[in-house]
UniProtKB/Swiss-Prot annotation:
The keyword Glycoprotein applies. This is Taste receptor type 2 member 113. Disulfide bonds: none annotated. Several bitter taste receptors are expressed in a single taste receptor cell. Residues 30-55, 123-127, 207-229, 284-309 are cytoplasmic. One of its GO terms (biological process) is detection of chemical stimulus involved in sensory perception of bitter taste. Putative taste receptor which may play a role in the perception of bitterness. Coiled coil: none annotated. Keywords: G-protein coupled receptor, Glycoprotein, Membrane, Receptor, Sensory transduction, Taste, Transducer, Transmembrane, Transmembrane helix. Residues 1-8, 77-101, 149-185, 251-262 are extracellular. PANTHER family: TASTE RECEPTOR TYPE 2, TASTE RECEPTOR TYPE 2 MEMBER 113. It comes from the Eukaryota. One of its GO terms (cellular component) is membrane.
Amino acid sequence: MVAVLQSTFAIIFSMEFIVGTLGNGFIILMTCIDWVRRRKISLVDQILTALAITRITLILLVFIDWWVSVLFPALHETGKILRMYFISWTVINHCNLWLTASLSIIYFLKIASFSSIIFLYLKFRVKNVVFVTLLVSLFFLFINTAIVNVYFDVCFDGVQRNVSQVSRLYNHEQICKFLSFTNPMFAFIPFVTSMATFFLLIFSLWRHLKNMKHNAEGCRDVSTIVHIRALQTIIVSVVLYSTFFLSFFVKVWSSGSPERYLIFLFVWALGNAVLPAHTFVLIWGNCRLRWASLSLMLWLRYRFKNIDV
């Protein structure tokens, strides 16, 4: 039964890896082409490119970790491999979450409409806001990485004092429990940021529709469409964070229980599926990427028709 589950989820993870790599690779390719053509790159494209690179790296890391755990379980449980994997995962996932939050901030400041002095001040300084946000994230990244590194150092010291506890100290389950406490704690700030921008955009859209109704105008103007597309992007970001938190809680709940192993694999697959899903939402929410993807699909459809003929 376990072998069947591993084979099934191996196929699922492989499909997620392929789809996620293609989607994020498309974003990187189109952004680079546009950068070379225009000789400049916008702030949104910079964040999208950095996010796409981070996503590819994260998906690749999880994909490799899965296959190493299946094919080489003894190697997967060694201290050096665990330290390398979890520190790498902590850094890459941290960048993924904060870049996603930064993208939500950009959409909010560029699209929302408020008369507050503070909002207007931030609206005309979007680059500075994003720069400060990412700078603050580096501080939290340093603390998070240091905590994980210290935890492994304590494990190494324990092994040197008591060799008989090697398997327990380097147990993948124990480290997952530890990270299930630290990583959600450091992901809380970008999660709250995305939630705040989501609700503020809803409020901005509600005010906009109310004003249009009062002025007896149509409800599908350009501003409304832009609001809705931004909300679609941010709501998937919120789902991404929610799945992130859920996966860690399920890891703690299902650890040490073979009966809950299926639930653990399902939530893990769901968490990994959110990444490529969010990528395609980003493509659909960006006008340039959306038209490029539609053009690519039409070209592929035309090529396949010619092959059939």
